[in-house]
């Protein structure tokens, strides 16, 4: 895990490495338009997406306002679970705090046509999520390189991008694909 026995980082503030986002956009044809990042942090995903899209950033921590406002004028400091913002987005993309992952998935599938979450691969295996995952199956894009969210070496677990599309939401099977490896520099 990211912590490896250490104290948990406040708000699970683990910025998403840009290469993780690049692997996603190389593999998945995401629509343009209005995108929302409901757990935006300081905007690492927004920074990494090279699409020209209209961003809305939502983040609970006030200290993230300034960096987010440099990326989008639509930066809101609030809890995505309690936001009064609309739900007419083309894409919802985030690397949510793991303890809020299911809530983020549910919020995203209501808020956007396409919902994209960077999650531990073992998100597939929970008994608590089994009913949801067997009736609302995502497409799963596995990152073959383990990301480092701390800059101090890689995690000990695998990660994947989980993608739900509103038009295929109620299905029992999704696809799984291992993405291209990122060369070590």
Feature locations, PLM:
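Class I S-adenosyl-L-methionine-dependent methyltransferase catalytic core
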Residues: 1-185
């Amino acid at each position: 895990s990211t912590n490896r026995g250490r104290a948990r980082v406040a708000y699970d503030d683990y910025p998403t490495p840009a290469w993780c986002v690049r692997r996603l956009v190389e593999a998945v044809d995401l629509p343009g338009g209005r995108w929302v990042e409901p757990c935006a942090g300081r905007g690492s995903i927004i920074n990494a997406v090279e699409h020209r899209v209209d961003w809305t950033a939502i983040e609970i921590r006030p200290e993230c306002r300034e960096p987010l406002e440099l990326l989008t004028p639509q930066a809101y400091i609030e809890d995505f679970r309690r936001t009064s913002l609309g739900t007419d987005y083309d894409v919802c993309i985030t690397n949510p705090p793991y303890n809020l992952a299911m809530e983020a998935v549910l919020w995203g599938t209501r808020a956007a046509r396409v919902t994209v979450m960077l999650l531990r691969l073992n998100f597939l295996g929970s008994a608590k999520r089994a009913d949801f995952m067997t009736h609302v199956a995502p497409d799963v894009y596995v990152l073959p390189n383990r990301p480092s969210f701390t800059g101090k070496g890689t995690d000990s677990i695998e990660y994947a991008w989980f993608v739900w599309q509103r038009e295929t939401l109620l299905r029992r099977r999704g696809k799984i694909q291992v993405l291209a490896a990122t060369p070590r520099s």
